[in-house]
Amino acid sequence: MSILVVDVGTSGLRAAVVRQDGSVHFLNYESCRPDTPSSGLVEFDPQKMADAVLRVCNATITQSKNSDTIDAVGITNQRASTVMWSKSTGKPLGPALGWQDLRTVFDCITAASEHSIKLAPNQTATKAAWMIQNYVVAKNLDFSDVRIGTVDSWIASVLSNNKLHVTDSTNAGATGLCTLDASSWSERICDLLKVDVSMLPKIVKSTGVIGNATALPGSPPIASLIGDQQSSLIGQGCINSGATKITFGTGGMLDVFTGTTSPTKMQRSENGSYPLVAYSDEQTTFWAAEAIMLSAGTNIEWLRDDLQIISTSQESHEIAMQVNDSGGVVFVPALFGLGTPHWDYGARGTLLGLTRGTTRAHIVRAVLEGIAHRGADMLEAVIADTKLSVTSLRVDGGMSQNLMFMQSLANTTGLNIEISPVTEATTLGTAFLAGIAVGTWPSINQATSTTKPAKVVTPTEKLDRAQWHEAVTRSRGWIPSLSSLDF
């Protein structure tokens, strides 16, 4: 019994087979990077994404046909990116807006000042409103023929030959358009933004059969939709209160499972984390809290592509290990500002403590340690907001393979670091939820029991957090106009 997983990320997408023992096979990947037509704008071509999804799915199915029977399909995706397409033809009505797109910043400010609605530009709400005005109203299109959805909705439509128009509660909760429990659309918010509720998808549970992938051989049932970070949370077995993971990709996302008690508001908490739906089944909605690092792996790319002091991302480990410490150098990884707990969009990357004796090894090590310090910042913020006890930290993403970085994370947090056996744990999470729906596993506990840490890194020393906090203070407010923004 096997599950086909479709994982659509920000820079690429993949398909793979997950077997009953939790092992991942026949992975096929295609790069699918967004376009940036000008500063602050992030778009992608939905049709190119759809074509790529079908290619990787068909490749994986072909490779697995002699060894695996596909029992179900699970879909996991970048959250909040917004697609608009025709109900009658299933074709896109214009470029999709990526979650990083900032063209609606002033719409968010207006929503807060005039209507007391707190929205962020990385949510779907104002993107959908912008698309309606620019793709529908401006072209005098028929409102009844318009569908709007996040990437999970779009891929479900593609795989079902335009039969399904659905999203799950984890994705709905990231739109800014739904009710507090993420079970239905808020008519008040939709009315204020002039988003017609009839254009939006039906909100379904994260696990459960919702239709068939008739665009694929055998038409397997689609049995799970879930946002990528929540999928990673489940994929690393974080299904008990206080269980915590960090995914280090382009940015860094820390999520802690908080249980079944719903939050009193779906807004940023006092220490900069956000409540969100972890996943939902027929009986229960489970909750989590999330902290965000705006820049993680991008700092390594900066060392490699711009400063050119490392040749490959993997070399950052080798170079950093040439010295015992950073030689007093501190790097604040704020290339795009600071997320949790500060939320200072005007902060900028800061390199302090340079001397004539500073080498590239010191700088590379300082960059890795700076990202680790940001991980500790996020952890402290989430603990303060949730009042939960966190006893270990599970980690996935490309940077989880850098053992020097993993050691720095252990030393800054004081926790054991449990490294995921699968770099992209998102693949496992949605597989588990789809498998539960069709009987591959009898329960979430049984499913997650199949995955164990590939390695556990324990703290060996305590890195200086006082000097770190001083460095962060110096990095903040560099661009005052951006620092004043509050979403």
Report residues per predicted region.
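Short beta-strand-loop/turn "lid" adjacent to the catalytic site in phosphate-handling enzymes
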Residues: 62-98, 120-122, 156-179, 204, ...
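Carbohydrate-associated surface elements
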Residues: 101
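Short glycine-rich loop/turn motifs
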Residues: 12, 79, 200, 274, ...
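Gly-rich Lys/Arg/Thr-decorated short loops/hinges at beta-loop-alpha junctions or inter-strand turns
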Residues: 32-43, 111, 166-173, 355-362
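Active-site core segments that coordinate phosphate-bearing ligands/cofactors
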Residues: 4-5, 105-123, 129-165, 179-187, ...
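A conserved helix-loop-beta module that forms one wall/lid of the active-site cleft
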Residues: 187-208
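N-terminal glycine/serine-rich phosphate-binding loop of ATP-dependent small-molecule kinases
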Residues: 1-93, 110, 142, 218-224, ...
